Amino acid sequence: MKWCSTYIIIWLAIIFHKFQKSTATASHNIDDILQLKDDTGVITVTADNYPLLSRGVPGYFNILYITMRGTNSNGMSCQLCHDFEKTYHAVADVIRSQAPQSLNLFFTVDVNEVPQLVKDLKLQNVPHLVVYPPAESNKQSQFEWKTSPFYQYSLVPENAENTLQFGDFLAKILNISITVPQAFNVQEFVYYFVACMVVFIFIKKVILPKVTNKWKLFSMILSLGILLPSITGYKFVEMNAIPFIARDAKNRIMYFSGGSGWQFGIEIFSVSLMYIVMSALSVLLIYVPKISCVSEKMRGLLSSFLACVLFYFFSYFISCYLIKNPGYPIVF
């Protein structure tokens, strides 16, 4: 019995020693890998450290950007690679600063510097952006970049510089919340500024001088301003925390959602504007025939013109509604 107890104690001591040694080795490997990060949190893969890095780190997401900084054998460079690399480093820096608790490692590998990666992944072109999720604890020893499953980000020239789209892609996979800063778009600002100034000057110089009762006009505008958001879905947008402007994969503004049970914030204003225009045209159609200072022939021409414009706007309204409800039967 005494010898049996001694054997059990020795066996437990050996197991504890092996566990402590393996834990220390794993910790040592993590520390060694983390020291390779640059200022934005990205690790550059070389031919020397590739065997170590390609085995991954337990519990960490591996975000791998495969690029070509120089030229290929034909002397051609990869412009898409250069364009996306700025986006890659920018988003990596945002995640490093805003979500330090997230267990992830960003890697950049140049196919000219690490040809073994090209053979392992059987690459035919560049660039590629892949994300390896952490391996299960019992399968960590089998984890390798060349054999493990991954998520792939679609890289095309249209989204190469879109930090918001790439940040959203990673945030969903890593299950984190980040805010990607956007560069100030001068061209877009000038466009909206000029448009607003034209409308403002037109109202000030043309509309207001002809208004005798300005208080009544402002009261009507205020009433419409309160009424229209209510009937066009402002509360729905507010309750569901829907963003005001949504963009598609090509960074274009989506003015209408593809379903009658959902809407974007911008739809409040687009639908309100269509209601206002059609209401104004209907009112003008009623009052134009009653204008005495205009000849009967001119009143007839104006009425016909307003009717055509109203028909056009209603047809446009129906075409927008078909985006929401493609099965709507009345189309003209």
Swiss-Prot record:
Residues 1-24 form the signal peptide. It comes from the Eukaryota. Residues 35-162 form the Thioredoxin domain. Pfam families: OST3_OST6 (PF04756). Disulfide bonds join 78-81. The keyword Transit peptide does not apply. GO terms for biological process: protein N-linked glycosylation; protein N-linked glycosylation via asparagine. Residues 25-188, 238-267, 324-332 are lumenal. It is found in: Endoplasmic reticulum membrane. This is Dolichyl-diphosphooligosaccharide--protein glycosyltransferase subunit OST6. It comes from Saccharomyces cerevisiae (strain ATCC 204508 / S288c) (Baker's yeast).
